[in-house]
């Protein structure tokens, strides 16, 4: 096959990448919402927040998105979704196979690819390879006002490097089972009054509903979504059924949108 390929020299490759990357960072250094974790709840939240017109930035420590979706069920490449979460997946064009009334099997690769694409197409910015290791806080009133970030590779190398800061009107902990952002805030800002009882063992039937019900604000400016909710609220885990994860993301997006609208009205 003969093909005429545009020739691009190395310096131009570097300049264009550096310029466009820095423009993104410069634009999003002041965001409406920062979501930590590009798993199912984080991506769902990003999709609905961006659709609502909020400047939404997602940090993911890995070089891929999807969180626990990719691992499927013990590396089996299928997952379970139940009603009414199927409505969210249909909205982003994920194909579902109904195996009993209200219960669906989905392909893990398709699920995470289409959910991420939907969030990006809605306007969310996802940046990989970045770890959030602290938060910004303010007093009078006491609130979380952003995050401190570092390259994941820098942390893995145990290099002593200061972070940079990203401001946000709302920070969402979608880091999963360890609720990493909320755990840091609880430890370093005790006046927030956050107590973390820890996640309980599996009880899928109850866990799904309880996770969605308990999704939301943990402290002013700080919210929990997905498995971070089970850690912070002492709820049971549910395993490879992902309805609550995407519903939790949608729920936290709706709460943040309302909270920020109220804040704008007050100011």
UniProtKB/Swiss-Prot annotation:
- One annotated GO molecular function: iron ion binding
> What Pfam families does its record include?
Thi4
Q: Which UniProt keywords apply?
A: Iron, Metal-binding, NAD, Thiamine biosynthesis, Transferase
Q: Where does Fe cation bind?
A: 162, 177
Q: In which pathway does it act?
A: Cofactor biosynthesis; thiamine diphosphate biosynthesis
Write down the EC number: 2.4.2.59
Q: Which GO terms describe its biological process?
A: thiamine biosynthetic process; thiamine diphosphate biosynthetic process; thiazole biosynthetic process
- Tell me which HAMAP family the record gives: Thi4
Q: What does the similarity note say? A: Belongs to the THI4 family.
This chain's protein is named Thiamine thiazole synthase
Organism for this UniProt entry:
Saccharolobus islandicus (strain M.14.25 / Kamchatka #1)
């Amino acid at each position: 096959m003969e093909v005429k390929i545009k020739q691009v020299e190395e310096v131009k490759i570097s300049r264009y990448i550096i310029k466009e990357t820095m423009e993104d960072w410069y634009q999003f250094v002041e965001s409406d919402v920062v979501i930590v974790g590009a798993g199912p709840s984080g991506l769902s939240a990003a999709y609905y927040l961006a659709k609502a017109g909020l400047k939404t930035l997602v940090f993911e420590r890995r070089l891929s998105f999807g969180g626990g979706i990719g691992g499927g069920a013990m590396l089996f490449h299928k997952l379970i979704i139940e009603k009414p979460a199927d409505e969210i997946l249909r909205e982003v064009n994920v194909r579902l196979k109904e195996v009993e009334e209200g219960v669906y099997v989905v392909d893990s690769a398709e699920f995470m690819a289409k959910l991420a694409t939907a969030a990006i197409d809605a306007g969310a910015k996802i940046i990989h390879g970045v770890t959030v290791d602290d938060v910004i806080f303010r007093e009078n009133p006491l609130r979380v006002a952003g995050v401190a970030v570092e390259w994941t590779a820098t942390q893995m190398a145990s290099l002593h490097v200061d972070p940079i800061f990203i401001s946000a009107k709302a920070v969402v902990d979608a880091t999963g089972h360890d609720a990493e952002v909320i755990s840091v805030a609880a430890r370093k800002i005790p006046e927030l009054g956050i107590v973390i009882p820890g996640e309980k063992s599996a009880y899928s039937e109850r866990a799904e509903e309880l996770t969605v019900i308990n999704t939301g604000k943990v402290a002013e400016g700080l919210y929990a979504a997905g498995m971070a909710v089970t850690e912070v609220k002492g709820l049971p885990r549910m395993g490879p059924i992902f309805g609550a994860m995407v519903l939790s993301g949608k729920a936290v997006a709706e709460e943040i949108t309302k909270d920020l609208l109220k804040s704008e009205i007050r100011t």
